[in-house]
Amino acid sequence: MAKSTGPIRAAGVVLLREDSGQPLVCVLHRPRQNDWSLPKGKLDPGENEIIAARRETIEETGSDVVLGVPLATQRYKVENRPKSVHYWVGTERPGGPGFTPNKEIDELRWLPVAAAIDMLSYPRDGDLIREAIGQPTTTPFIILRHTEAMRRADFRGPVDAERPLTADGAQHAVRLVDVLDAFDIRKVYSSDSLRCLDTVRPFAHQAHATVAHEPLLSEEGFASSPTAALKRLDQILGDGAP
């Protein structure tokens, strides 16, 4: 098999927990490279960076993770191939399998910030920790467009709000489940258009969440009363829940 020469895409997390009010950082020892680094790994075929960052963190640390704000993307070369690693701040959440030493990662340590930076083998990883620690506490608020819907010109229904997703759109809605779950989304709001409701229903089903119907946030609702629609959006933002 010919050796790949294309770009390498990877994703990772600066994984944090608190101890007596102080942040601790997860650092990992890789015996093959004999180095200390942060949780990260290559994307699987067809995978996006968000899902890969969470998957690699669970696989390498045994801790499930909630992603926070994105951090700087690292870019460097490996064997003359360009590599990009997308990072997020991450915090632990219950449900991980726990860490088991293995041939890929044989040691895991939770260290105070300064000690973690000193332990890491690459200065660029220390820069990521400094960036992560400097981020404010945030709550995710995701604005999501519906997945692929039937073309307006092909739809024969009485009202456009009943225009459905295509088969590809329905598949994309299922793939969004893991993306939304990575941010621990708990409340789901949707326009009352069928294509929007069907985009979020797979996630809502898995998360055991009720989808709140929001007519003002539909295409037609906004067109009829932009001021009321924006006011409703502000109310949802003010709720403060992910």
Where are these regions (language model features)?
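N-terminal strand-loop-strand
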Residues: 2-38, 141-146
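Conserved Nudix-box catalytic region and its N-terminal flanking loop in Nudix hydrolases
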Residues: 21-64, 154-163
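Short coil/turn segments at beta-strand junctions that form active-site/ligand-binding loops
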Residues: 22-23, 139, 184-186, 240-242
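Nudix hydrolase/Nudix homology domain
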Residues: 34-35, 97-151, 155-157, 240
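Active-site-proximal alpha-helix that buttresses catalytic centers in soluble enzyme cores
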Residues: 41, 138-227
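Unchanged
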Residues: 43-128
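A generic secondary-structure signal
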Residues: 131, 175-182, 232-235
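Active-site-adjacent alpha-helix immediately C-terminal to a catalytic or transition-state-stabilizing loop
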Residues: 228-242
